[in-house]
Amino acid sequence: MIILGVDPGLTRCGVGVIEAGAYRRLSFIHVDVVRSDPKTSQDLRLLAIYNGLVEKIERFAPDAVSIERVFAQENRNTVLGTAQAAGLAMLAAAQRGIPVALHTPTESKLAITGNGKAEKIQMERMVARILGLNTLPKPADAADALAIAICHALRPAGALQGGEREQHLTAAQRQWAQASQKAARRQGVRRGM
């Protein structure tokens, strides 16, 4: 399975591509940063990011696209640009019928290091170790994109979009999801919802 990970950003959008083989064996394929010029207008910046993402998707033909979930940041302009870039990645994948998954930074840290509060350097070292890289992936956006792809390989059920979730779950994950749904329904009945 080829997984394309995206660390969304309006100035720098990290893209990492890995292959998940049998027995969770992960292999490095590609890492890059799609850039836009902060001096140009917003629409042209978005177009540059979109075109770069489309080029990567068409070049590597991933089976899944995994995107870092946008969360609130103090700088409103930063979160807006990040959300727009994430939307472009979702659009580019959806137009090609590729399943999209969203993973939080905490999920990614937990899947890769076992610690949801791992420092960036710990993440970079583990990404390099997992993928057998001799050097740490740089810049940080590139390392984060690889981390998101690895997270999806290790935790494929993470917030899949477009109703594709069930086909990517293991039997145990399906049973857990069904039990969780039943428990939620029972709680809803007890609360009179």
Curated annotation (Swiss-Prot):
Cofactor binding description: Binds 2 Mg(2+) ion per subunit.
Source organism, top-level taxon: Bacteria
Keywords noted in UniProt: Cytoplasm, DNA damage, DNA recombination, DNA repair, DNA-binding, Endonuclease, Hydrolase, Magnesium, Metal-binding, Nuclease
Gene designation per UniProt: ruvC
Record's subunit section: Homodimer which binds Holliday junction (HJ) DNA. The HJ becomes 2-fold symmetrical on binding to RuvC with unstacked arms; it has a different conformation from HJ DNA in complex with RuvA. In the full resolvosome a probable DNA-RuvA(4)-RuvB(12)-RuvC(2) complex forms which resolves the HJ.
Disulfide bonds: none
Protein name: Crossover junction endodeoxyribonuclease RuvC
Family: Belongs to the RuvC family.
Principal location class: cytoplasm
EC number: 3.1.21.10
Cofactor: Mg(2+)
SUPFAM superfamilies xref list: Ribonuclease H-like (SSF53098)
GO terms, biological process: DNA recombination; DNA repair
UniProt subcellular location: Cytoplasm
GO MF terms held by the record: crossover junction DNA endonuclease activity; DNA binding; magnesium ion binding
Residues annotated as the enzyme's active site: 7, 68, 141
Task performed by this protein: The RuvA-RuvB-RuvC complex processes Holliday junction (HJ) DNA during genetic recombination and DNA repair. Endonuclease that resolves HJ intermediates. Cleaves cruciform DNA by making single-stranded nicks across the HJ at symmetrical positions within the homologous arms, yielding a 5'-phosphate and a 3'-hydroxyl group; requires a central core of homology in the junction. The consensus cleavage sequence is 5'-(A/T)TT(C/G)-3'. Cleavage occurs on the 3'-side of the TT dinucleotide at the point of strand exchange.
Residues that hold Mg(2+) 1 according to the record: 7, 141
Pfam families cross-referenced by the UniProt entry: RuvC (PF02075)
Organism of origin: Bifidobacterium adolescentis (strain ATCC 15703 / DSM 20083 / NCTC 11814 / E194a)
GO cellular component: cytoplasm; Holliday junction resolvase complex
Binding sites annotated in the UniProt record for Mg(2+) 2: 68
Reactions accelerated catalytically: Endonucleolytic cleavage at a junction such as a reciprocal single-stranded crossover between two homologous DNA duplexes (Holliday junction)
